[in-house]
């Protein structure tokens, strides 16, 4: 099986994790395993637990990483089919209560976008789906056909920053009165009709923001990210690091705010000196986000919007 996906900020993500021999690490978004393979090469001992909610990614990894999965009686890689918001629960099943590092590569993987039947892309005609975990019931078809006009407009504006969210929501509700909206191309046409012609000619594909917003809502991406970051930080051993790659401003804002919250000490009002023993939980490894090099930008278009933030547990 193939899972063709070029990992973004590969060396920056793993090198800043500062992996130590014998450590326990978590890949929260295993995907095609590009980051995992690089980390496993750097670790002569230790183990990696790879999470992915996409069964296709897990099945592919079972084949592509067979050597690491079956290494003697102590496999260096273990795979978990679950969303990364269940870190503590799943790691506890493996007898793990603390980790030395964790990394996230957020967003949709190339295979998910390129598999037309997954319904993620406005480039292919398929049934509206967009579920990262295909065992989940709720999908894009249900969202588009069941949310009321205000709910639709709110989703498009909040998660897609779509300035024509109200017009698009109104057009969706009008169209589905006749029959359900079933496919990606049907939705694309509705979006195009709702956006003024002048606006359609600039800023990329007119459906890009709406499709992002619907995907985020279907998969509860921002809620599960917040929950997962909290669990990850609590699981880190002292000196352990967390690396997070984001591809859109809402994700980056959550990561930045979470790291800021745990890297600062809240001093009670009127207290001039920080009491002894009170210290922050995290240290920011990089004050500003790390972005792709000129070389990577030229080779991988997906890297243009990527931002990496890294923090260390104190």
Swiss-Prot record:
Signal peptide: none annotated. Keywords: Cytoplasm, Methyltransferase, rRNA processing, S-adenosyl-L-methionine, Transferase. Gene3D superfamilies: Putative methyltransferase TM0872, insert domain (1.10.150.170), Vaccinia Virus protein VP39 (3.40.50.150). S-adenosyl-L-methionine binds at residues 33-35, 52, 84, 105, 112. SUPFAM superfamilies: Putative methyltransferase TM0872, insert domain, S-adenosyl-L-methionine-dependent methyltransferases. The keyword Zinc does not apply. One of its GO terms (biological process) is rRNA base methylation. It is found in: Cytoplasm. InterPro entries: RsmH, SAM-dep_MeTrfase_MraW_recog, SAM-dependent_MTases_sf. GO terms for cellular component: cytoplasm. Its EC number is 2.1.1.199. It comes from the Bacteria. One of its GO terms (molecular function) is rRNA (cytosine-N4-)-methyltransferase activity. It catalyses: cytidine(1402) in 16S rRNA + S-adenosyl-L-methionine = N(4)-methylcytidine(1402) in 16S rRNA + S-adenosyl-L-homocysteine + H(+). Belongs to the methyltransferase superfamily. RsmH family. Specifically methylates the N4 position of cytidine in position 1402 (C1402) of 16S rRNA. HAMAP family: 16SrRNA_methyltr_H. This is Ribosomal RNA small subunit methyltransferase H. The gene is rsmH.
């Amino acid at each position: 099986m193939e899972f063709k996906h070029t990992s973004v900020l590969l060396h920056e993500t793993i090198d800043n994790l500062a992996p130590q021999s014998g450590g326990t690490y978590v890949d929260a978004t295993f995907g095609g395993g590009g980051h995992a393979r690089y980390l496993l090469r750097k670790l002569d001992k230790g183990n990696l637990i790879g999470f992915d909610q996409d069964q296709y990614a897990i099945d592919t990894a079972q084949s592509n990483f067979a050597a690491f999965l079956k290494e003697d009686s102590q496999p260096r890689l273990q795979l978990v089919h679950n969303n990364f918001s269940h870190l503590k629960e799943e790691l506890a099943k493996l007898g793990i209560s603390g980790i030395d590092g964790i990394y996230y590569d957020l967003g949709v993987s190339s295979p998910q976008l390129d598999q037309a039947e997954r319904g993620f892309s406005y480039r292919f005609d398929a049934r509206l789906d967009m579920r990262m975990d295909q065992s989940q019931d709720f999908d894009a078809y249900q969202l588009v056909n069941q949310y009321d006009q205000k709910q639709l407009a709110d989703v498009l504006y909040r998660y897609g920053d779509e300035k024509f969210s109200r017009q698009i929501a109104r057009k969706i509700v009008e169209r589905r009165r006749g029959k359900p909206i079933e496919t990606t191309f049907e939705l694309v046409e509705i979006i195009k009709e709702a956006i003024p012609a002048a606006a359609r000619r600039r800023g990329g594909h007119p459906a890009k923001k709406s499709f992002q917003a619907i995907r985020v809502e279907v998969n509860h991406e921002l809620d599960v990210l917040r929950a997962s970051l909290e669990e990850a930080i609590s699981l880190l051993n002292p000196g352990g690091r967390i690396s997070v790659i984001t591809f859109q401003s809402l994700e980056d804002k959550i990561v930045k705010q979470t790291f800021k919250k745990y890297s600062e000490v809240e001093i009670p009002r009127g207290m001039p000196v920080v009491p002894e023993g009170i210290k922050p939980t995290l240290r920011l490894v990089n004050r500003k986000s790390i972005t792709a090099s000129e070389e990577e930008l030229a080779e991988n278009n997906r890297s243009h919007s990527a931002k990496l933030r890294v923090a260390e547990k104190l």
